[in-house]
Amino acid sequence: MALENLLHPTNIKIDEYAKNATKFSFEALERGVGYTLGFALKQTMLYSIAGACVTSIKINDGKVTSLEDVIPCDETVADIILNVKSLSVTLAEDVETGTITFELSGSEEEIFSEEAKLSEGLAITEEVFICSYNGGKKLKIEAKVEKGVGFRPAQDNFKDCEFLLDATFSPVVFCDFEIKDARVGRRTDLDKLELNIKTNGNVNCEEALRLAATKIQNQLRNIVDIEEINKGIFVEDPKDINPILLKHVEELNLTARSSNCLKAVNIRLIGELVQKTENELLKAPNFGKKSLTEIKDKLSELGLSLGTLIENWPQDL
């Protein structure tokens, strides 16, 4: 079958069946394409979309060191850790880390997330119950918030006076897909792809799907043009390339924010970076004008610029 005759989904339905939960259906697709797309989108949404979350918690300035310690509230230490960990948070574009603080004293009361003191650039997007404070003794809860991509397991349970947490950065909290039979005319050997997506509210489901599709598209862009692949891309010896282009982007000494943005889109070498346009970089998650300006300035110091075509760039580095 000619590539141009492959079916593309023409019947697309969007069903927002609950808050921050949407089911998407796409039909009709060639047999097998539904599974291929569904699996790729699911994995990308769960593990490759950037976000922010609580990564560690300190109680009473680190004096509480065990889940068995007694604190002045109805909940256990473990309960409070789980409640604080469940907070949906966002960090401003130019902020990499933040702090959430609860300082409790006086009479007993129920404490919710809206009573927290937040560092600059940090926001809590949904109200969450934290604890039932019993009054009397003071109670201080500090939570560290970081940006990241995918999942990062805690290397220890408790370190440096803090309870360390497994970090799930993706704003997509659930994604699954199902393949059903579809029909077009007399053809009954087709796929219908149904995607079920739930987010924490920091990104809506449609935006999460778009981000995932864009990431997959960027990964595949070098093999989209079949004619170029058939011709074969033969490159010159790397020694003929400016050695600066073969250095890792870490040698530019960028800020953590800019470095993380480049890692998120798999830009490892300076040569890969200079071949990107400004618009391409601005489409990367959490990549803003400050990062763009910083990168342009660093490249300029080396006599380089964005949007540079490198004809003999090795594709297998």
Curated annotation (Swiss-Prot):
InterPro entries: DNA-dir_RNA_pol_insert (IPR011262), DNA-dir_RNA_pol_RpoA/D/Rpb3 (IPR011263), DNA-dir_RpoA (IPR011773), RBP11-like (IPR036603), RNAP_asu_C (IPR011260), RNApol_insert_sf (IPR036643). SMART domains: RPOLD. The keyword Transcription applies. It is an enzyme of class 2 (transferase). It comes from the Bacteria. Residues 1-227 are annotated as: Alpha N-terminal domain (alpha-NTD). One of its GO terms (cellular component) is cytoplasm. The keyword Transferase applies. It catalyses: RNA(n) + a ribonucleoside 5'-triphosphate = RNA(n+1) + diphosphate. Keywords: DNA-directed RNA polymerase, Nucleotidyltransferase, Transcription, Transferase. One of its GO terms (molecular function) is DNA-directed RNA polymerase activity. Gene3D superfamilies: 5' to 3' exonuclease, C-terminal subdomain, DNA-directed RNA polymerase, insert domain, RNA polymerase, RBP11-like subunit. Its EC number is 2.7.7.6. GO terms for biological process: DNA-templated transcription. Residues 241-317 are annotated as: Alpha C-terminal domain (alpha-CTD). Homodimer. The RNAP catalytic core consists of 2 alpha, 1 beta, 1 beta' and 1 omega subunit. When a sigma factor is associated with the core the holoenzyme is formed, which can initiate transcription. DNA-dependent RNA polymerase catalyzes the transcription of DNA into RNA using the four ribonucleoside triphosphates as substrates. Belongs to the RNA polymerase alpha chain family. NCBIfam families: PRK05182.1-2. The N-terminal domain is essential for RNAP assembly and basal transcription, whereas the C-terminal domain is involved in interaction with transcriptional regulators and with upstream promoter elements. This is DNA-directed RNA polymerase subunit alpha 2. The gene is rpoA2.
